[in-house]
Amino acid sequence: MRPRFALLFAICLAALAGTALPACAQDNYEIQVYGYDLVEPHHTMVELHSNFTIDGSKTIQDGVRPTNHAEHETIEITHGFTDWFECGFYIFTSVQNGDGWDWVGDHIRPRVAIPKKWKWPVGLSLSNEVGYQRPRFSTDTWTWEMRPIIDKQSGRWYWSFNPTFDKSLHGATVNQGFVFSPNVKFSYDFTKKITGGIEYYGSVGPATDFLPTGQQQHQIFPAIDLNLSPKWEVNFGLGVGVTHSTDHLIAKMILGYRFDF
């Protein structure tokens, strides 16, 4: 089977798998595997992350609202300062029947990268994200995410690996160590305008003592990127949860635009 058709078959298979997998709950405000590239110096990227939980948790757990039929809208604004540094800011919101539109919290995300002029064999950058979320949306109100980013474009093929580590700074799990949350993306350029691939998002528990499989979170997103122009970013996908601790079915879309300021 030719590589492009093998990948297309895998995307379709993963999408169909959603009809037979169990459900549960976790936060889903920005669903994205990061690439190495930074926003260019003196430019600003504005993104809207829209995520709708088609089938999620249906009861309040530890004071946190259920995710079923929740629409999460996140605004991300990132400015490039140099060829090795950018900084992003997030505004998280949630919309649910009967509760209206709620502000969830804000995060700030500085990121550094190996400059392209060094010509390393892979892209390498490091993101650190710190922020607050209201108790009704998370049992941990202040958190820190440390995300190394490694990626590579080889012809039409692309892969990215984000071995992410999360830490509570205030809340229910503040005494717990770093939680390992790996994210992975494989994609293929079917045409100059259309890229298809698979995105994986996981959270397996403390880095030194993984949780039992049933308590871990694992999501698989068949996803499409539309390469409309260098200024636009368009990504959408349908995610399937494959453990009882993961929301069963989520639709996501990212729409971004690069401004020359």
What are these regions (language model features)?
Residues 1-10:
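Bacterial N-terminal signal peptides that target proteins for export
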Residues 19-25:
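Sec/Tat signal peptide C-region and signal peptidase I cleavage site
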